[in-house]
Amino acid sequence: MESLSQHTPMMQQYWKLKREHPDQLMFYRMGDFYELFYEDAKKAAKLLDITLTARGQSAGKSIPMAGIPFHSVEGYLAKLVKLGESVAICEQIGDPATTKGPVERQVVRIITPGTVSDEALLDERRDNLLAAVVGDERLFGLAILDITSGRFNVQEIQGWENLLAELERLNPAELLYPDDWPAGLPLEKRRGAHRRAPWDFDFDSAYKSLCQQFATQDLKGFGCDGLGLAIGAAGCLLAYARETQRTALPHLRGLRHERLDDTVILAGASRRNLELDVNLSGGRDNTLQSVIDRCQTAMGSRLLGRWLNRPLRDRAVLEARQDTVACLLQDYRFESLQPQLKEIGDVERILARIGLRNARPRDLARLRDALAALPQLQTALSPLEAPHLQALAGNIRTYPELAELLRRAIIDNPPAVIRDGGVLKQGYDAELDELLSLSENAGQFLMDLEAREKARTGLPNLKVGYNRIHGYYIELPRVQAEQAPADYIRRQTLKGAERFITPELKAFEDKALSAKSRALAREKALYEELLEILIAQLAPLQETATALAELDVLANLAERALNLDFNRPRFVEEPCLRIRQGRHPVVEQVLDTPFVANDLELDDNTRMLIITGPNMGGKSTYMRQTALIVLLAHIGSFVPAQSCELSLVDRIFTRIGSSDDLAGGRSTFMVEMSETANILHNASERSLVLMDEVGRGTSTFDGLSLAWAAAEHLAGLRAWTLFATHYFELTVLAESQPVVANVHLSATEHNERIVFLHHVLPGPASQSYGLAVAQLAGVPGPVISRAREHLARLEATSLPHEAPLREAGKPQPPIQSDLFASLPHPLMEELARLKPDDLSPRQALELLYSWKTRL
């Protein structure tokens, strides 16, 4: 671009700052507006639907501009962050009254999708994460930072597949990776993914920086020894957070090493298919979290979301949670705790904003109310005997001195920002009170002074006044001016009057004229002092917030167990999964009719169920409810079943539903096969596998062959498997595979209409009811009638599929004919009509040659 010397002084200042932040939209403060210039203005006008103008000139060209009022900036920032944009906030830090030329300006903070902390820019019930990754194709170091809570986690992950699955689980708002990685990588498609210089991931500088941040000699205490790649990623995150926040980060107090082998692994497809926190339409209604989340605090809801997306395999922790839920259910103890927890609010994020020194007055008011509620909450916890509850109670400390300080300092309902003052209580600081009194009571002082001076001088026409040029004055008519006392100092002569000032009035003037600005400066300084006092107590306060969030989740699980009729599952060492009267926790909430509960029994002798039955019969619901019951058990929750006994699982896989991956260029069948391949490669005998309609995306024989082979493979792995299929040929697997059993969803026909009974019964289904379901769906009658004709012909003429030999005395498994299978070859029809006894040998030979030619 042109030399800066060609620009006006103000635009020179702008370009110097903009060159330091080329990738961010710059909000450049000018009076009561944030202005955007040039390409930033054009982009913002389009994204925010604001007016683009061109005013003035610089370097001989008009300047494209767009402006935003400073008092309504939060709404615009929220929209930009949601769109994945980053913004540099440039404020006036100089005094316009004393500055020659452009007022000094400085970028005071950078707002990016992964580092926002303002309440207005965040979803209060969802984590907002910043991630960094470094490594090669074999091993990756991944670091995750939640700047709004201070959680800072690291892990090392084997292979691209596991890395991408973990990123899908975490769903970070921003992802940083080295600039020297090749183009076209899968993670480049993620929102908020952008490159950083390779040296930002350097291990040595990262290690030093992290030790400095945590005030430690090394990182051994965090269990991070040997995690070179993860430490490099963590160092990059710390540097990025410092760069964007422009302040110390005292709420980042340590690292936590996460291990995949501590958790039940859920593939991305499994998380989507089970609709844990997002439904298949992308919304949040009718998800597992929408049903089981009645947490009283936003931080509790966020913790519950993390539990659902990262179930545990630690039996001791899970049983401690179960004991806590059981304890809170006794005598309905949770009912007294939940209203108290509601008074606590989102302390976790408030403390983070205090650490970042951008806490608002209302944050401190909420913290004041939370601290005031803690003693009563602690009293309520003290008699509860569950060991885990006692451990939580030990971390929920009271802070009487801080509570009293905030009670004395902050008014009951403070304004949103400190900018205009009016936050601190009268009586908190004598100097502030005096300044405010001067500012607010100047008129009364002048009236009192006028009355006193009239009485002292005996001059009834004396007036006390003020003008902007000469300030405060005492005015006397010219005829009385000679009678002015000796301490009156002449200030101004008018046509018919003289104006004076006294030492007392001069002293008042000096105070009053600067009182408002001095009061505001004093109040801001006192507010900063309050933040520093709170920052000094940040570590114990954060421990308390963590304990409060977990208490909220456990009290919520107790409430849900009572009101949704959930019961305690029992973990056992014996490999098994036994569910009595299990229910789907989401479906039962939206049904107008009672949900039909069903049993499930898998053990070391029965590892796989082949599930048959009509469409809409409930196969998918039965499979999903099993997975959700297992998942809820692995977060320490009670489950929607009369009883449940299970061993720990290592993974939950689902191959359910079908959809194209248009962005990835994959067909429905390709997506299905990719998910199937992932399951077949990674499932173990401790995995739960749900397979629904495998093979339906291709031709009948290809699909059947693939489904059959996949089922045999899973049976060989001895994974806990629910295999729903319309290929009735698969029901014979139970005869050749001892660990396989058949069940079906019951249905019946009444007056040529299908009635779904939804009961799971032993054995294969007797028929598919496909045409009855089509009729129920509204397929026209003539089409149904024609389909019946085709079905009868296909059943009469199609060759049966080969299957393993049956044992003597066992019934023939039912054959499901596929409405969309290929029609039989014409030769098959001729062969069916042929009467061999009517043919001579010569005719038979000619016919054989004819058929051979036509094949």
From Swiss-Prot:
Keyword annotations from UniProtKB, A to Z: ATP-binding, DNA damage, DNA repair, DNA-binding, Nucleotide-binding
One GO term of the biological process aspect: mismatch repair
Gene Ontology terms: cellular component: cytosol
Top-level division of the source organism's lineage: Bacteria
Any one GO molecular function term: ATP-dependent DNA damage sensor activity
Entry coiled-coil feature ranges: none
A Pfam family matched in the record: MutS_III
Residue positions binding ATP: G613, P614, N615, M616, G617, G618, K619, S620
Signal peptide annotation: none
InterPro entries documented for this protein: DNA_mismatch_repair_MutS, DNA_mismatch_repair_MutS-lik_N, DNA_mismatch_repair_MutS/MSH, DNA_mismatch_repair_MutS_C, DNA_mismatch_repair_MutS_clamp, DNA_mismatch_repair_MutS_core, DNA_mismatch_repair_MutS_N, DNA_mismatch_repair_MutS_sf
Keyword presence, Phosphoprotein: no
Family recorded in the similarity comment: Belongs to the DNA mismatch repair MutS family.
Function noted in UniProt: This protein is involved in the repair of mismatches in DNA. It is possible that it carries out the mismatch recognition step. This protein has a weak ATPase activity.
Protein name: DNA mismatch repair protein MutS
Source organism (scientific name): Azotobacter vinelandii
UniProt lineage: Bacteria, Pseudomonadati, Pseudomonadota, Gammaproteobacteria, Pseudomonadales
